[in-house]
Amino acid sequence: MAEPRVFLKENRGRIEENYLEQAKNLPRVFAPVDEKLQKCTEEVALACKYLYAFMPYSDIGNYPFEVFLDYAENGVKLWKENPQVADLPEEIFLNYVLFHRVNEEEIAQCRTYFRTEIGSRIQGMNFREAALEVNYWCAEEATYHCTDDRTLSAISVYRRGNGRCGEESVFTVNALRSVGVPARQVYAPKWSHCDDNHAWVEIWCDGKWYFLGACEPEEILNKGWFTNASSRAMMIHSRVFDTKIPEGEVIGTDGMVTMLNELKRYAVTKEITVTVKDAQGLPSEGAEVSFEVLNYSEYAPIAEKKTDSKGTARLTTGLGSLHISARMCSDGEWFYAETVMNTEKEDNCELCLVSQDKRNDGESEKWTAADIFAPHDAPVNTDMPTLEQKAKGNKRLTAANAHREQKVRNWSNPECERFLEKKVNRIEEAIAASYREDLLRVLTEKDRTDCISDVLEEHLELAIPYHSMMKKDTFVSYVLNPRVDDEVLQKYRREIKKHFSRTEKQELRDDPSRIWNLIEKAIVSRPEKERSSVITTPAGCIRTCTGSFLSKKILFVAIARTLGVAARLNPHDRSMEYMKNGRFVPVLARTEKNCTLILKAGETVQWKYFQNWSIAKLENGRYTSLKLGAENFEDQILNLPLESGNYRILTSNRLPNGNMFANEYHFEIQPGETKEIELVLREADLEDMLENISMPEFMLKTEDGTEVKASDLTADGKHILMFLEEEKEPTEHILNEMMEQEEAFAGYAEQIIFVVRSKEALETPTLSKALAKLKNIQIYYDDFSEIINTLGRRCLLYTSPSPRDS
């Protein structure tokens, strides 16, 4: 008789050990957690301990035990009731089924709810089948919508019915994990062929990882709109929060999080070697090497390594250009080196470190061209659904869209209505009521979809006493407003107020800079126990006495506002400020901007920051881009006050094939100096702009509905296919121009194919007139539901799409 399975038998010891270490470091927080664990079953308690053992300190401070209990109970239930889940390797189960965090999202209870919603739809399915079905459910509930940088919880994406790709994938991963399908989010941190990034989902089955587009269901795995785009990536990564790292190439860490290289599943790759030497030509062991791609006109890191005893670092990457920089600190002095490497043609590169203080001299202050090559797309993931599968998928997707549109048509967050209607005590009722709409109005659109009435109520109640002490706009934006940065919106004012006596509160109001001194003494930063992009809330900082530098800055603003002091983080550089004598003053003395850079734009280029130019300062062996705010060129001149030091200006011209013509200008500026530089954008020749793009097969219809392959229509030579939206631009404009050049187009009419939705389109004035003038043009039909997107995305591999998203 087989022995009964033991839950997490292989990892039990290390889970207990790591949990005890966390509890030892945060005893005040873990005392009530331990009490609650004693009331759980042995399996649920162990699952909870795993979550607590490997979660960031921010999660420990931000969320109550009951949130994590939902994840633990659901995971244990799956393990007990689903043989497929019980058969998973423990590391796969722990990291990709049980674990609560996907990326940097808000954490909220969702797993049990999702399982009850989805469970009946996947009865009897294997992981592959279940993953496809779950993704249809996700498409029924949410779709893409461009939003701000704060990442919603999975349940909030479900409720509001949309999110950006990073939020769609957080939602889909949680849905998959809720029913036992191992899943994770993967990222192209920056594309090489266009200014953007993207996130999607991988699922584990049959011992391998497969991918799918979040909320973008297909009838097969390893298929998504981004399939070709991913074959042009220089890096695709996943992340793991556990300290026991799965097999794979580690490409960097973010505090407690380890990043893994997943590119081989998507693109043609090779291993490159970087050798770093010091000024004497000796190997530099322990140098930090950053591998970067040019994106949004700045060099953005996609992987980081440290050199070994031979001064070498190796990376598996795609076949394109990388900007590679290295830095090292010796006796308090930083050394730096950089180069551009085309990995398609080169296997190795060598960097020689020089003191960053000697990085620039007068002779080097000139524009230097750099050609940046994007990888070619390659047929790596070529599986395609059959015609029957596509037809089935289209039908299901249409139904999913209809369901979702009905769900979100008139949806609004009921918590907002509850907050607006709530009455406060009799004395303050009239005053508070007048500020309820103001409080909601000062929140972001995203905040209004997931805020909680009780949270807003505390902020209103404890801020109202200060409303008459300043201008209304100042009070609403910088005292009443619960939002400081991208932190989770929670209560904190009552928690803060009880920490100070009446005398202490008045002293802090009189000199708000003292708030920061108190924070520095009371709150410690443990970056090795955090993820930099996950913020500890003000109340969480107080509970755990820990927080990142950003979390502590947010805490400063929260304390100041709680005490009635108008405060904010500066929108340009996130520096702490409070209002004094009607203007914001910095809490920490800023480095003096003691010199001036005058940039000349010229007359032919429209310069847009982080689109075709940027400027970065060299500090601690690393260039950091300046976050310019509302600065604009006036009469082709931009005056930038700067701190003295070494800088690099980048300009970039993205070509249709994804390559870039870059220009770099390195310079040093001294205290008191005024320096003039004219921005230069490299121009492209016509031959640089042209590109042959291989298009996927697609079907069109004749007038009688017969389907015809596009390849058959173009078998006898080159053709122009024009998908026309009658009586809309740019169709109308193009048709009129064709008629103006009737003679030039007449000789090519037989090679021109107009694609329209219906016969009625042919009767519209401009189109019917064009057909009368340009005889022999062929007419075919399509409903524009799929082909347009497919072809458009294929072409977008070679152009810059819409604003950044993640």
Annotated model-derived regions:
Residues N295-T316, N620-I637:
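Short, acidic Ser/Thr/Gly-rich low-complexity loop/linker segments typical of extracellular
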Residues K270-D278, C595-V605, T799:
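A short, amphipathic beta-strand motif
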Residues E3-R160, K390, K395-T544, I554:
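Secondary-structure boundary elements
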Residues A279-E298, G320, D511, E603-K627, ...:
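Short, ordered, surface-exposed loop/turn motifs in non-cytosolic proteins
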Residues T116, S120-Y136, H145-S156, R160-T253, ...:
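Hydrophobic/aromatic-rich core segments of domains that either
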Residues T766-L796:
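Short, internal strand/loop/helix patches
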Residues L713-T731:
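Short active-site neighborhood of thiol/selenol oxidoreductases, capturing the structured segment around
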Residues Y798-D805:
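Conserved small/polar residues in nucleotide/adenosyl-binding loops
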